[in-house]
């Protein structure tokens, strides 16, 4: 039976995050926006992450699981991109979580003319071990990718050169074969953005900062 094409593919690379994974997956499956698929890429995790992913896939048909030998964060995300069928792409780290309106607010920010292809960016909350919270606000605006210097100043200056807290157009990604660069640690998100942005019709920055929760700790996503 032919599978319906979802509007959004949510890609989660998974590695050694057993204590956080259930909260992450549950937060995505609880979205008010329901037209999405969830791609969980188990990057050879040594703990029970692979089993947890399979358990969720058995309970929810929107969940698709891919198991691979450990190859690193970039390769795990690329595996998700390889299999993503949605019109749009969102990344969530497996040790973070999102509020129930996260996808809805990103999707609602897109232009009415869906033939335009670009990027929506939002702020996020950073949660610290002591329970304190720091909200990273971004100035609400629209930037044309042709203004490269302004794009870089806004993104780098506001510390939002992460793959997550964004909605990408999968048509651009597929058409231009855009991927994360393997074996690059710490810069893979920025390099992906720099490959992607020149093809975008727009860059929408929206100050919906409380929807993505980045848990500040020693990051344990795919190594």
List where the protein language model places each region.
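Nucleotide-sugar donor-binding/catalytic module of glycosyltransferases
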Residues: 1-223
């Amino acid at each position: 039976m032919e599978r319906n094409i979802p509007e959004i593919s949510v890609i989660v690379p998974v590695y050694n995050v057993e204590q956080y994974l259930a909260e992450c997956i549950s937060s995505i499956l609880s979205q008010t926006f329901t037209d999405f698929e969830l791609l969980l890429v188990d990057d050879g995790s040594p703990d029970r992450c692979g089993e947890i992913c399979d358990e969720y896939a058995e309970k929810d048909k929107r969940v698709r699981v891919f198991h691979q030998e450990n190859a690193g964060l970039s390769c795990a995300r690329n595996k998700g991109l390889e299999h993503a069928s949605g019109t749009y792409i969102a990344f969530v780290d497996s040790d973070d979580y999102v509020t129930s309106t996260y996808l809805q607010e990103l999707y609602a920010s897109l232009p009415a003319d869906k033939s335009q292809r670009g990027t929506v960016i939002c702020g996020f909350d950073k949660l610290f071990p002591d329970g304190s919270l720091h909200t990273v606000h971004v100035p609400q605006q629209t930037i044309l990718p042709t203004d490269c210097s302004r794009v870089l100043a806004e993104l780098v200056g506001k510390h939002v050169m992460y793959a997550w807290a964004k909605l990408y157009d999968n048509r651009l990604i597929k058409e231009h074969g855009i991927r994360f660069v393997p074996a690059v640690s710490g810069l893979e998100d920025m390099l992906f953005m720099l490959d992607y942005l020149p093809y975008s019709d727009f860059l929408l920055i929206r100050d919906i900062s409380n929807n993505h929760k980045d848990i500040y700790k020693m990051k344990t996503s795919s190594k």
